[in-house]
From Swiss-Prot:
The active site is at C75 (proton donor), C213 (proton acceptor). It is found in: Cytoplasm. InterPro entries: DAP_epimerase_AS (IPR018510), DAP_epimerase_DapF (IPR001653). GO terms for cellular component: cytosol. Its EC number is 5.1.1.7. It comes from the Bacteria. Belongs to the diaminopimelate epimerase family. Homodimer. Substrate binds at N15, Q49, N66, G76, N77, N155, N187, E204, R205, G214, S215. This is Diaminopimelate epimerase. One of its GO terms (biological process) is lysine biosynthetic process via diaminopimelate. One of its GO terms (molecular function) is diaminopimelate epimerase activity. The gene is dapF.
Length: 270
């Protein structure tokens, strides 16, 4: 039997998503497999991550799947996209999004300017290996390695302050998933600092290299502040646009665009 699923395609600075309202999904769907099928760029719709959302009384719940069918704990760009979608569909400008137990406070300043307060970050979590272990690995591949630091912003990030070519970023990103370093994998951020801006590339756990990463931007900004490389406010520069970042009372606030690409119907065999 073939069923129909309504979807929305959006992107944040090139980091693209297929977004589906949970009410349009049958309880019989294998969501992990559905995510893999819809994310496939040749036989599906194509995206970096598959997003399911559900409206509750005073918040929206967001569930995130990677293209390999695994779940993700946070996605800053998807949060901005979902906030814009809710604004377009309801007119709401102040929107609370919950991802697991993480509360994200969103404000739609205008259609192309969405702010997300992602809360505080942590530099001390059980999953984080010692700096010496990470440094010993990273210095094998890096030229002009300045610093490495782990950040937890609801999902795990390793920030490497160094320059690395894209083909090498892929190699390093994959090798850093080694279980002896990161038992559950890690998002790897390659950051260069210049004139209080961070030029950022991210290898995302479960997705690979993407054109932008909102949570990576937040983690890299927080790391840059902690290390004294930048001050607040600052700008994170990606290939297809920038995010404005600031710190207020220990909270990280991300601001940037979200783009509606298409609305459509996906036909699924059950």
């Amino acid at each position: 039997m073939i069923s129909k699923i309504n979807f929305v395609k959006m992107h944040g600075l090139g980091n693209d998503f297929v977004i589906v309202n949970k009410r349009d999904l049958s309880s019989s769907y294998d969501l992990s497999q559905l995510a893999k099928n819809m994310a496939e760029r040749h036989t599906g719709i194509g995206c970096d991550q598959f997003i399911i959302y559900e409206e509750h009384n005073d918040f929206y719940e967001m569930i995130i799947y990677n293209i390999d069918g695994s779940s993700a704990k946070l996605c800053g760009n998807a949060t901005r996209c979902l906030a814009k979608l809710i604004y377009l569909d309801t007119g709401k400008k102040d929107i609370t999004v919950m991802v697991g137990n993480k509360k994200l406070l969103c404000n739609v300043n205008d259609e192309n300017n969405i702010s997300v307060n992602v809360g505080s970050v942590s530099f001390n979590e059980a999953w984080m290996p010692s700096r010496d272990k990470v440094w010993a690995f990273a210095e094998r591949y890096m030229i002009d390695l300045k610093e490495t630091i782990c950040v937890d912003i609801g999902n795990p990030h390793l920030i490497i302050f160094s320059k690395l070519e894209p083909q090498d970023q892929k190699i390093v990103g994959e090798k850093l998933q080694a279980k002896e370093l990161f038992a559950d994998g890690v998002n790897v951020n390659f950051a260069e600092v210049k004139d209080n801006k961070i030029y950022l590339s991210v290898w995302e756990r479960g997705a690979g290299l993407t054109l932008a990463c909102g949570s990576g931007a937040c983690g890299s900004f927080a790391a840059g502040l902690k290390l004294g490389f930048i001050h607040s406010p600052s700008t994170i520069v990606f290939k297809h646009g920038n995010l404005t970042m600031k710190e207020e009372n220990g909270n990280i606030i991300m601001q940037g665009a979200a783009t509606l690409v298409a609305r459509g119907e996906y036909y699924c065999e059950q």
